Regions:
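Short amphipathic alpha-helical segments
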Residues: 30-32, 236, 725-727, 780-782
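Inter-lobe coupling/hinge segments of SF2-like helicase ATPases
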Residues: 278-285, 289, 302-730, 735-740, ...
Length: 825
């Protein structure tokens, strides 16, 4: 789909618009004023995208309208440029979502348009393309030989041609020669906006007024086709041909005779979601019903509320969601259900589809661009009332939101690690506040911050202490791997785990093994010189992958075929170390050759729909053992799984991050909770070289309250969230010394502003220091940590410093960003 814009700037109305412009820098980002040509007066609306001339060269760029206002004396009209085109028939963002974009700019230190692009499906974006064509009636004899060839080429096309096509066909590196021909009057150029994905349409046929005429001679096939089209009043050409057994030649003949006309009807690229009318109503336990009633009371209050649904693994939190949704779905308010991993989406969609059918839309990155665009349009048109998806689902374009549910709310995948660096929980709070809606945060292991707020009354608290039905929490054994090695066990599996795996295989029960490291071996070192094989672009060791016999970097994607030669000393003495999911899968296959083993990690699930196929296959009993990374630990419900094994706990505990204990406790509790969810009792084995560690003991007991009471004291003593916010200022550049200098210069600038403008502001500053992985993709990374209160004064201070620092040309090659409450510090 394309949009061609015309020059209509001479006839301007008395209307101006404030426009957020794409690809601006944070330093210079603002809402820019433009005049509205009179031809566009009835077309412009807040939330529509426009094409505008921008900068000294008047380069065409996309923007989105934030405000409309009459021409005012405050802005000299003669200095304003005019918009070139209106791209959208309808606004793509509501006033609420535009307000959200302003919120995101302030809180996440991004540009307006970065926030806007985050909310829109990629398929709806336009690409601005320059085209060149020949001017008629010019004498090309004065052109150079190369210019004449270009002129003849374009003349033969009889229409303007995209610049990329011309450059490719003539082997040109740039458009200099084309621009010279434009200036000389031989060529003209125009700009067109092409959308990345077109709407899906179906060719339809409908009868004209002549269809009832008896004076036109028809064949039997033509008569049968015309009768069917008249009977339906309009139907797809494909269906007409199918039911009458003809080809499109017959319909084309009717079209030429003037008896039918063709038109396109929009269709949606979505999978079938059929409601199961035979399903029994959702049955809740007494605890579940109490929680559901409490949540509904908050929903019905028509004020913004946040509630924490805290329930042990297997307590039936999903059933509470569905019952609550059944009670509110007919209130004409949007419902958003978020899950942290794509791997959880298929089970959720399957479960919810059986209850709610085509009222569901799905938002996540595994969908094609066309599918994502169509789901977005279904929601915007009011055809779907429930959106299920990952982090991006929080931006679903409902006119009014009534309920947002965040399952496994503690998961870090809800936090974006690229600009805008938002947390879906904060976006959900904004939307619920704007629409007086209810936000439900659900988890068996809530984030420390969320449970703290629930205990202190900022959130309401609903608790489920028992597993649903007859299921009980699994028995947990902590295996001491030191003792295993002393006893001569050289495998990565304790005797207790092997014994229970053997029992499950003999009794047709399923098992899950968690190892949160993909690849075969996690590092490769040289026996002679002791040097590890590292990525040339990053300060990190390469991981060996047996599937393709390559050593790969999990940061930048660099890979190299495996050879036995050490790149440092050139001896053939490389040895493998560490265990990844591929190696665990291989070793289990050797120990149990008859076992059907499925590996599930990002290497194995890279293709579209692979998650769903794997989960379905395991749920159907086609595999005995599931080996995977953290994506197998959360939210999945397999009643036949009675054994869970955690192969390596220790490296998670001792990560260089204040959240490592919380992450480890949550992951262990969640994966242990996958066992024994059906009628059979479950078992879990946690393997560790530090079996007496307090976090492991509490996770084995599934004792969140004990973990919380310990962790909250540490957080308070160390001034970590929720007692302070932690803002990470990141610096990245190709020159290490320049990047270090930039970090120190930023610190001086920040301290100077803070002392002069906010002398009473409580701040603690750490660094600058190297990032945990100092070099990634040939760029050196440094960080500055600021413990603060994330309020308007602090954000204003930081924004002013970032803008001032960004104007310093000395550090133009160093990128700087701010990340509030970053995942790792």
């Amino acid at each position: 789909m394309k949009s061609t814009f015309l020059s209509l700037t001479k006839m301007s109305s008395d209307l101006t618009v404030k426009v957020a412009v794409e690809n601006t820098t944070y330093v210079f980002d603002k809402l820019f004023d433009y005049l509205v040509p009179s031809a566009f007066t009835d077309l412009v609306q807040v939330g529509k995208r426009v094409l505008i001339p921008f900068g000294r060269g008047n380069k065409k760029k996309q923007g989105i309208i934030f405000e409309l206002s009459p021409v005012s004396d405050d802005i000299p009209v003669e200095k304003l440029k005019s918009i070139s085109s209106v791209l959208d028939d309808e606004p793509v963002l509501s006033k609420e979502l535009l307000n959200l974009a302003e919120f995101m700019k302030e809180h996440y230190f991004c540009t307006y348009y970065d926030a806007v692009k985050t909310m829109l499906p990629a398929g709806i974006n336009y690409k601005i393309t320059t085209l060149y064509g020949v001017r008629e009636g010019v004498d090309e004899e004065e052109l150079s030989e190369e210019q004449q060839r270009i002129f003849a080429y374009l003349h033969s096309k009889r229409k303007a041609v995209k610049s990329d096509k011309i450059l490719d066909d003539f082997g040109l590196d740039n458009t200099v020669i084309l621009e010279d021909m434009v200036k000389s009057g031989y060529l003209y150029k125009s700009d067109e906006a092409f959308r990345k994905v077109s709407d899906a349409v179906m060719k339809m046929a409908a009868p004209t007024e002549l269809a009832d005429s008896d004076n036109i001679k028809l064949t039997e096939k033509q008569k049968a086709v015309l009768d069917l089209i008249k009977m339906t009043g309009g139907t797809s050409v494909k269906e007409v041909c199918y039911f009458t057994g003809v080809t499109t030649g017959v319909t084309d003949a009717l079209y030429k005779k003037g008896l039918i006309y063709y038109y396109d009807e929009e269709v949606f690229r979505i999978e079938d979601r059929t409601k199961d009318e035979s399903l029994a109503p959702v049955a809740l336990s007494e605890q579940q019903q109490t929680a559901c009633d409490n949540l509904y009371a908050e929903y019905a209050d028509s004020k913004p509320h946040t509630s924490l649904l805290f329930g042990v693994t297997g307590s039936g939190k999903t059933s509470v969601f569905m019952k609550l949704i059944e009670r509110v779905i007919n209130d004409n308010k949007g419902i958003i259900v978020m899950v942290p991993e794509i791997s959880l989406t298929p089970q959720f969609v399957s479960t919810f589809s059986k209850r709610f059918g085509e009222q569901i839309a799905v938002f996540h990155s595994a969908l094609s661009l066309g599918e994502r665009l169509d789901e977005y349009k279904r929601v915007k048109k009011g055809l779907a009332k429930i959106v299920i998806g990952t982090r991006s689902a929080v931006f679903a374009p409902f006119e009014k939101v009534g309920l947002i549910i965040m399952d496994e709310e503690q998961e870090y995948s809800y936090k974006s690690e690229s600009s805008p660096r938002y947390h879906a929980r904060e976006i959900a709070k904004f939307r619920c506040s704007y629409d007086n809606a209810l936000l439900v945060l659900s988890s068996a292991t809530p984030s420390v911050e969320s449970y703290y707020y629930a205990k202190n009354g900022r959130y309401s608290l609903n608790t489920l202490t028992e597993r649903y039905g007859d299921a009980v929490l699994p028995k947990v054994v902590v295996a001491d791997m030191n003792v295993e090695q002393q006893n001569g066990n050289v495998t990565g599996f304790s005797e207790t785990l092997l014994e229970n795996l053997r029992y499950n295989l003999e009794n047709n029960k399923q098992s899950i093994l968690l190892l949160n490291r993909r690849g075969y071996n996690t590092f490769v070192t040289c026996r002679m010189c002791g040097e590890p094989v590292v990525c040339p672009n990053c300060s990190i060791s390469l991981t060996y992958h047996s599937a393709n016999r390559r050593m790969m970097c999990h940061y930048c994607g660099y890979s190299v075929p495996y050879t036995e030669e050490c790149p440092s000393c050139h001896s053939k003495s490389l040895r493998f170390g560490g265990t990844g999911t591929q190696k665990a899968e291989s070793e289990i296959s050797e120990l149990f050759p008859d076992a059907r083993i499925l590996r599930m990690d990002t290497d194995a699930t890279s293709s579209k729909s692979s998650y769903e196929k794997m989960i379905t296959a395991f749920a159907d009993g086609k595999y005995d053992i599931l080996v995977g990374t953290q994506m197998v630990a959360k939210g999945l419900d397999f009643p036949n799984v009675t054994l869970v094994g955690v192969l390596n706990t220790d490296y998670m505990l001792y990560a260089d991050d204040y959240r490592s204990y919380e992450r480890t406790f949550s992951l262990l509790t969640q994966v242990v909770g996958r066992s024994g969810r059906g009628a059979s009792k479950g078992m879990a084995v946690i393997q560790s070289y530090t079996p007496d560690n307090l976090i492991i003991s509490m996770a084995a007991r599934q004792d969140y309250l004990a973990f919380y009471s310990t962790e909250i004291q540490v957080r308070k003593a160390m001034l970590y969230p929720p007692f302070a916010d932690i803002c990470l200022i990141g610096f990245s550049g190709e020159k290490q010394q320049l990047t270090m200098k930039a970090a120190n210069s930023f610190l001086q600038c920040f301290v100077s502003h803070a002392r002069s403008e906010y002398p009473a502001m409580p701040l603690r500053i750490l660094g600058p220091s190297p990032a945990n992985v100092v070099k990634v993709s040939n760029k050196f990374r440094y960080k500055l940590i600021i413990k603060c209160k994330n309020n308007r004064d602090f954000r204003g201070l930081l924004s002013a410093v970032m803008i001032e620092f960004g104007k310093n040309k000395e550090f133009g090659q160093v990128s700087t960003y701010a990340d509030m409450n970053a995942l790792t510090c």
